[in-house]
């Protein structure tokens, strides 16, 4: 089996790329970072530090790399069996034209073997969104062939991979936590279902997408935003602050009540899942910066993302949301010189005030009770 993975960054190398290579799949990375490409093609291997209670160093070998903006990547798409991505939500649209060109070449060369594409991004139904971008880049005459031969498979991914702080300055070295979860929608594949250790197949993906979004992502973001306000540098420092931990745990319990109501998750098992995530945030081997986790607050405050979507669920079912509201208020306070979205958020609040700004960003009714609650919490934490 041959696979092409877009995104040779830390998540690409430390998570999805590692799983594919470990499964014996012939793997090629595609990226724009020439330093990383050159290193991969010189060595064809790299080291992954898996940290937790039992620390280990794994070597991933037998890998190659191509530029994601050259002709080589188009040629590869014509012949591989699987394409995966870990490029970040905003970059999916940028890689779509190359994928479209590769699919056209695949069709022209008469390669009718099924191809499956899986976007492994921190977003809901990311592959479906990628499919939309790819279809927009195709001529009408090619779309039916793509629909017939190419599976666009949505997935939920979960592994904390902080930026590398390698003392060796090795551009390929990466550190990851022990925990990982890659759940894919088996109803969307073309051809036979793949057997890849570490890939879990389900016919109820949205339950797992929302479980991860409402728990890991919600908790991670609120920990970062409250931690930044309190002057903590890392997620571990923040979650060990009892006042922050109480709000984060409370928010995950509030979002969890939505999941239990919506999907029938077992309450005791979900409580254990929350505890596991709190333990992951405490991992002393992961130096995860609150500023990194908090970046892009406009996206994280949008209607379909980790703060507002669970809040909407509590409104739908008439459930408590006091801690989620505290997290939203903390997100509105997020400031970072390194993050354009943080600067845009600050400008919007200055221009329109917190009530109108939150309504514009989140899609919530400016005159609703819940926006008033969030504004009160925002003003109380100035």
Curated annotation (Swiss-Prot):
Recorded catalytic activity of this chain's protein: D-mannitol 1-phosphate + NAD(+) = beta-D-fructose 6-phosphate + NADH + H(+)
Species this chain originates from: Salmonella heidelberg (strain SL476)
GO cellular component: cytosol
Keyword Cytoplasm set for record: no
Pfam families: Mannitol_dh, Mannitol_dh_C
Database matches in InterPro entries: 6-PGluconate_DH-like_C_sf, 6PGD_dom2, Mannitol_1_phos_5_DH, Mannitol_DH, Mannitol_DH_C, Mannitol_DH_CS, Mannitol_DH_N, NAD(P)-bd_dom_sf
Keywords, in A-Z order: NAD, Oxidoreductase
The protein's name in its UniProt record: Mannitol-1-phosphate 5-dehydrogenase
